[in-house]
């Protein structure tokens, strides 16, 4: 039998170990961490912490207590940069705008005469069948998803669902809304139960703000890489004004390399001083030699910034979806979706790859020069 003093010492050590684990997790909330107890990679989310008032008894005899499951909701997709560039083009060319407006057919709404009743006593507009179903019925599967006792909340839900979503989405499939459409088949209508309660509206998460505006036009981008690509692609002349700050003051910049744990004063692999490059989205740092960067990459990231592998997004569309379709340039380390390139690529090249901007800037010194 263990003594009381020994038991208290074990509890103190356990508290210290838990506090160190939680402190390490709080420092890196944006990245998945490896849980040694379950041997899985987990990600911090609002579902991690549960209160006592969230518990409710389960109908399953093998379950003592369970928590209500919360449905995952995808944020609204941002408008593509092509729409912004098109609006800028039409603003500078009003004659083209007038021609488009002239060719576009105008949709005329129904008049009250066409929808009025045949009798002269009253004039009413009859609501459609779908509107009546939305007001009088509520779909059962929405309640089943929220209150089903067979589904249990877990710390791994957020991480695993994100990985599955990335793997299943194709390059052509684009999600425009997270609201499920109610099928209009006879079998689905028969499952609807009458209810006069107010239909609960779907709450969307606020989309990420575009905090990198262009100093020459009204275009805005979510990442500095997208802004740099926009300025190089649309504005050929070099801007006389200084570029926006590469790193936000709200980001905590790491002063040590994530690969060799060295600093700017000494690289532990080469035993020589070497400047660190930091991600402008999360603040993680690394030595260019530890990242296997060549001189071209170092030159570009000093001017345009750098994104680490976890924060990497497509420079053209600005999203990080379909990361298995991302192609990285060997001269600037920017990421491009295979289907966002012009012309689009079916698969990544077997040898080195250089984007169009690097081929123009470095010429024959690029990793993959343009074919003449």
Curated annotation (Swiss-Prot):
Gene3D superfamilies: Zinc/RING finger domain, C3HC4 (zinc finger) (3.30.40.10). Pfam families: DPF1-3_N, PHD. It comes from the Eukaryota. GO terms for molecular function: zinc ion binding. SMART domains: PHD. GO terms for biological process: apoptotic process; chromatin remodeling; meiotic cell cycle; nervous system development; positive regulation of double-strand break repair; regulation of G1/S transition of mitotic cell cycle; regulation of mitotic metaphase/anaphase transition; regulation of nucleotide-excision repair. GO terms for cellular component: cytoplasm; nBAF complex; nucleus. Residues 108-204 are annotated as: Disordered. SUPFAM superfamilies: FYVE/PHD zinc finger. Residues 109-131, 184-196 have a biased composition (Polar residues). A zinc finger (PHD-type) spans 256-314, 316-361. It is found in: Nucleus; Cytoplasm. Its main location: nucleus. Residues 132-141 have a biased composition (Basic and acidic residues). Residues 142-158 have a biased composition (Acidic residues). Belongs to the requiem/DPF family. Probable transcription factor, involved in meiosis and stress protection. This is Zinc finger protein dpff-1. It comes from Caenorhabditis elegans. The gene is dpff-1.
């Amino acid at each position: 039998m263990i003594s009381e003093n020994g038991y208290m010492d074990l509890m103190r050590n356990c508290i210290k170990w838990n506090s160190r684990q939680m402190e390490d997790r709080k420092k890196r909330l944006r990245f998945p961490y490896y849980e040694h107890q379950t041997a899985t990679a987990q990600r911090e989310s609002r579902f991690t912490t549960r209160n006592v008032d969230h518990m409710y008894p389960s109908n399953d005899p093998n379950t003592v207590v369970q928590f209500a499951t919360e449905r995952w909701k995808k944020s609204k997709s941002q408008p593509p940069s092509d729409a912004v560039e098109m609006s800028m083009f039409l603003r500078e060319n009003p004659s083209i705008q007038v021609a488009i407006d002239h060719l576009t057919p105008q949709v005329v709404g129904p008049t009250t005469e066409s929808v009025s009743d045949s009798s002269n006593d009253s004039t009413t507009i009859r609501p459609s069948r779908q509107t009546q179903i939305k007001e009088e019925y509520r779909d059962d599967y929405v309640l089943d998803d929220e209150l089903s006792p067979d589904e249990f909340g877990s710390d791994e839900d957020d991480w695993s669902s994100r990985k599955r979503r990335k793997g299943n989405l194709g390059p052509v499939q684009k999600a425009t809304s997270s609201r499920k459409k109610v099928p209009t088949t006879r079998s689905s209508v028969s499952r609807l139960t009458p209810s006069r309660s107010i239909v609960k509206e779907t709450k969307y998460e606020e989309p990420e703000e575009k905090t990198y505006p262009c100093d020459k036009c009204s275009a805005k981008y979510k990442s500095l890489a997208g802004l740099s690509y926009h300025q190089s692609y649309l504005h050929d002349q070099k801007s006389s004004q200084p570029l926006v700050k590469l790193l936000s003051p709200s980001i905590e910049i790491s002063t040590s390399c994530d690969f060799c744990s060295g600093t700017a004063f000494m690289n532990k692999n080469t035993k020589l001083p070497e400047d660190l490059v930091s991600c402008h989205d999360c603040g993680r740092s690394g030595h260019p030699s530890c990242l296997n960067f060549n001189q071209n990459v170092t030159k570009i990231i000093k001017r345009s910034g750098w994104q680490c592998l976890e924060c990497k997004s497509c420079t053209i569309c600005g999203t990080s979806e379909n990361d298995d379709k991302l192609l990285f340039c060997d001269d600037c380390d920017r990421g491009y979706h295979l289907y966002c390139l012009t012309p689009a690529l079916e698969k990544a090249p077997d040898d080195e790859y250089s984007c169009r901007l690097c081929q123009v800037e470095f010429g024959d010194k690029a990793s993959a020069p343009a074919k003449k």
